């Protein structure tokens, strides 16, 4: 499998190297990194080329790297049923730079891009219906960003007396506590008889 992916990586470098910023084989998986400007052209080539045949878009997801200038990675997972191969295509972007929508190439990208926008705040240009898909309409923020508070901003519950869903400020039942204990799995500092070599 990884031999076929290595051959594919060299073929893509020759055929469309201008669309690929980086190519990486790691753990038997091929990851192509491209730019937003080249994304649609690369996805179209991967779908239409006879040696590729990546006709299935399995998933699109986001990754948040807050310490980087281009904070987000948008990751496309593709499948070629004829070749029995999977690859990953990555595009890096920031909070203000939109990524071109993959919907013209893979119509199934619609909900994946909506989810990525809803969870991370990554904008997609040319998307037919970019709106929230998992969170509520009035939701503030994007919950999978690393800077989103783990408690959220509001608490949502059904009020049986009012017969409707109500939003309330988050009220923590106890103060934040930091449990900083030694792990019982780290072991002790002393050496038992017979373990002298293991501690060296």
Swiss-Prot record:
Primary gene name: nuoC
HAMAP family referenced in this protein's UniProt entry, alphabetically: NDH1_NuoC (MF_01357)
GO CC, alphabetical: plasma membrane
Membrane topology term: Peripheral membrane protein
Protein name: NADH-quinone oxidoreductase subunit C
GO molecular function: NADH dehydrogenase (ubiquinone) activity; NADH:ubiquinone reductase (non-electrogenic) activity; quinone binding
Assembly description: NDH-1 is composed of 14 different subunits. Subunits NuoB, C, D, E, F, and G constitute the peripheral sector of the complex.
InterPro entries assigned: NADH_DH_suC, NADH_quin_OxRdtase_su_C/D-like, NADH_UbQ_OxRdtase_30kDa_su, NADH_UbQ_OxRdtase_CS
Alphabetical UniProt keywords: Cell inner membrane, Cell membrane, Membrane, NAD, Quinone, Translocase, Transport, Ubiquinone
Signal sequence residues: none
Disulphide-bonded residues: none
Source lineage: Bacteria, Pseudomonadati, Pseudomonadota, Alphaproteobacteria, Hyphomicrobiales
Function statement: NDH-1 shuttles electrons from NADH, via FMN and iron-sulfur (Fe-S) centers, to quinones in the respiratory chain. The immediate electron acceptor for the enzyme in this species is believed to be ubiquinone. Couples the redox reaction to proton translocation (for every two electrons transferred, four hydrogen ions are translocated across the cytoplasmic membrane), and thus conserves the redox energy in a proton gradient.
EC number(s) from the headed UniProt entry: 7.1.1.-
Gene3D superfamilies for the chain: NADH:ubiquinone oxidoreductase, 30kDa subunit (3.30.460.80)
Catalyzed reactions per annotation: a quinone + NADH + 5 H(+)(in) = a quinol + NAD(+) + 4 H(+)(out)
Subcellular localization, as worded in the UniProt entry: Cell inner membrane
């Amino acid at each position: 499998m990884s031999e076929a992916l290595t051959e594919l990586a060299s073929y893509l470098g020759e055929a469309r190297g201008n669309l690929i910023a980086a190519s990486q084989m790691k753990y038997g998986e091929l990851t192509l990194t491209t730019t937003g400007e080249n994304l649609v052209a690369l996805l179209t080539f991967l779908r239409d080329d006879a040696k590729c045949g990546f006709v299935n878009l399995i998933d699109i997801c986001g990754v948040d790297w807050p310490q980087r200038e281009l904070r987000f990675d948008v990751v496309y997972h593709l499948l070629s049923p004829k070749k029995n191969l999977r690859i990953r295509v990555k595009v890096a972007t920031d909070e203000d730079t939109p990524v071109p929508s993959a919907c013209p190439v893979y119509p199934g990208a619609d909900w994946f891009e909506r989810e990525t926008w809803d969870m991370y705040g990554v904008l997609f240009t040319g998307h037919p219906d970019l709106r929230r898909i998992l969170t509520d309409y009035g939701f503030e923020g994007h919950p999978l960003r690393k800077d989103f508070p783990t408690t959220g901003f509001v608490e949502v519950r059904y009020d049986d007396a009012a017969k409707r869903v109500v939003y309330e400020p988050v009220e923590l039942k106890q103060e934040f506590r930091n449990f900083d204990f030694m792990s019982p799995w780290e072991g002790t500092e002393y050496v038992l008889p017979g373990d002298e070599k293991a501690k060296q």
